[in-house]
Amino acid sequence: MNLNKHLEFFNPLKIEEDIHIIGVGAIGSNLALMLTRLGCTNIHLYDFDKVESINVANQNYFERQVGFTKLEATIENMSEINPNIEIEAHPEGWKKEHIMSGFVFLCLDNIDTRREVVLKCKNNKYITAILDFRMGLSDAQHYMADNQDEKAINRLLDTMDFTHEEAKAALPVSACGTSLSVLPTIWTVISAGVANFINFCKTNKYKHTILVNPFESIVDAF
């Protein structure tokens, strides 16, 4: 894969750690392809779901992939970009028994499971950082924590002080009850999060919180 477009700015070959993407839906499927185009490899994917026709509008899948597992479709799309990419699939989804190291990208729908992942990673010296992505219809949030910084991890856990049911109740839905989401919101928060990841890899500095609303041209980071 020819990386000359960005190699002088970001060299993925310097990243020796594994990358774990937990959930390959709206956020995770698009994130996986962005990291692939950057040249990242040694990627672990976790998901147990299948591609449905409704997913094609906001997830990185195609109509011909309806019925595939999301892992099958994501791996196919990543391999089209970089045939030499190294991917490990976990079709059972994330389980507490999984042993992880490196970077953990949280792209799950369920806040309770997100919290479980962070608690499992806490105090694990082999986890470098945790990057969390959440979105509504027009706004989204990205949170990041250096896993060796206990204060940062506790700050991340503090943002998860609500239940999955409370989160669902706050999401806008269509007349038929489908959760609404659009690509401008998805791509904006992913771009912000991946830029945060790159900055951390290059300088060890990062933003703990990034809030975006592409429809009002708002990005706030601190």
What are these language model-derived features?
Residues 1-222:
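Adenine nucleotide-associated cytosolic modules
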